[in-house]
Structures are given as C-alpha cells and as structure tokens.
Amino acid sequence: VIERRTVFKAALAAGAATMAAACTSGGDDGGAQTGGGATAEAPPAAVITAEPAADAKNVPVLQPVTVKVAKGTLTEVKLTNADGKAVEGKLSDDKTTWTSSETLGYDKTYTYNATATGTDGKPVTLTGSFSTLKPASTVRVTLNPTDDATVGVAMPVSVKFTSAVKNKAAVERALKIETSTDVEGSWGWLSDQQVDWRPKEYWPANTTVKVDAKLYGIDLGGGAYPRADVTTEFKIGRNQVVKIHTPDHKMNVYRGGSLYKSYPCSNGKDSDVNLNTPNGTYIIMTKEPSAIFDNARYGYTNVNKKWACRFSNHGEFIHENQDNAANIGRANTSHGCVNLLEADAKNYFDSALIGDPVEITGSRLGPVVTSDVMDWLVSWSAWQAKSAL
C-alpha cells in the first residue's frame, strides 16, 4: 500500500498579495482599520492530490490511480504510459475525482497531468510520475475446458500454472464459477501447480459454465505474478456414464440414467493384481482413432490399437483389441485396459465426450491417485479438504 500522498497548491502572485492584504487588513503600522472596515478574504485556490504519489515505486498494478481536487473542479486529467498511450479513466459527476479504469502493466512508468479550476477561478496544475512493481517472474496460467467445448458430466475445471503457487488462498479467492443451473462444488489443489473445481455430484446435463480467473496482479508467492487474467465458457453435454464391474466382462453405457449400450469386454488380468483395471471413478481424458502402446516390461512395444479413449494417466484406455477377441466377454486378460471388439470400440468412441465418467468396480486393485486427473477418486469431504479456504 502506498502511504505517501502528494499535495500541490497553486502559488499565485496575485493570491499571495491578496492574502497579505487580508492578514494586515490595510491601514497604518498600528494595525488600525481605515476606510470602510475589514478587507474580504480571497476565495481559496484549488488543491489537487494524487495517489500513487509522485515518484512512488513498486505500485501494485491493481491499485487504481486517483486524482482529487478540493476547493475546485477538475477540468482535465491525463494518465499516460512510457509510450505516451493514455490510460482510460472516469471523472466523477461532481468533477472532483478522477479514477483510472484500466489495469496497469508490470514494471511500467506512468505520468499524470491534471488541471483544476479553483473557487477563485484560477487554474492549478499537477504533474507526477510513478512506477509499478516488477515481478521476480511471470507465470503462464491455462484453463481447461477451453472456450466453446462440450464436455461430459464429470469434467472438472482445471487451472494450471507454469510454476508453484504458494499463496493458494489468494488464488482461490480470485477464481469465479458461474453456472446456468445451481451446482454445488469446490476447488481442490491437486499439486502446487494445479487447482481443480468439481461439482459434488455429476454436472446436470446441458449446463453452461463460465469461469473467470482474475489472477493478474496477484502475488503467487516469491514475487511470481500471473501474466494475464484467463476466462473460459463451455457447455456440459448429455449425461453419459460408463459402468464396468470387472468380473462381469461387460461395459455398460448409461445415458440419462437408462442403459444405452452394453458391450462385451476383457479387463485387466485377474491373475496379476498389478495388471487389474483399478477401481474408481475416472473420466475420459483423450480420444485417439489410432494409438501406439508400449510396455517392454510386459513384452509388447509399438502395438497399434484403434479407437482409444484414455481414462487414466496410469495407462488405462478403452480400445479395440481384435487380437484378444477370444477372451472379450469371457475372461479378463488385458494389461489393465478395457478391450472391446473393433465394431463396438468404434461405436463407443463415436458416442464418447471428453469428461464422461468411467466407473470401475469389482477389481482387486484400488484407485490410483497419483494422476493429475483424480478428482473423482476421493470422497466429497476429502475433496473439500483440498481447498485452501
């Protein structure tokens, strides 16, 4: 906070002479009045003040610049950057206060020039310069989903930073979620570089979501500041949920709460718990018409499979595996993925949205919570505990 204030007062020769006359009231050396009585006091000159003060350093970029006048009205105020470009501002209705309405830049010098007319009818001017804070570093911030995306009902809002955030509470306070339908949700930090917002329950279908991350000017910690504010607006699509109870060898797809499709599948190998398809609620993260799979530990490299929908950063996909057709619908023999017949894999691929939930039950392997997309793998109370507020 800038403590110093600058006050400029007109030093007008005529005004000085008038004040001298008023103080002495005219007359002889004894101070006796002559003529028709005391001389009337001159109208006061305008007094202009500005904040930040002249020569102020490290001014916060979110602090508005204000220019005020007492004993008069402002006739002109200009605030310019080092390139001479004017900064937008607004004059109050009574013409006594000017306030900037444009955000200032980091590590910039600004100059203000103000003119006012006092009650004495005479002009007064004020000129000064100040400089804004210089970040130790600037941080790129990204938002997902992106503008105009249509996503599934389990899709979280994800805010990622290119460096660690220390002042997490300050960041959360600057993040705003607006929805077309009332939705209860919470922010939760998955790491020092990522904070997500997820609803308590799956999003209502067809909800419009607006995210406003007003982060510019907020100290993330250690003098690191975001480069800019970021925003996004996206839509939640139809309600579609994949449910797989691994012992059943079936992948059921529900739409709007009713069974939509049922596909025979082969899940992670039952005989090796490390290859089980892990329990938990995941989301479709990516969709690839053709994907290359490599895992030399388990004896395969450069294997091409079609219609691959990733649902975990642990390495699990829903994809076709025609080579495993003999076991699909009969036995769990995969390396952790959900294997489908090619036609079924294509059919599901075409129906899926990024953000669709995938619910896995019946496995001996518990949820893998090391992923940066693990929002639905913890209870609601555990998720709320990840908030910094």
Predicted features along the sequence, with ranges:
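Gly/Pro-biased beta-strand-loop elements
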Residues: 139, 223-326
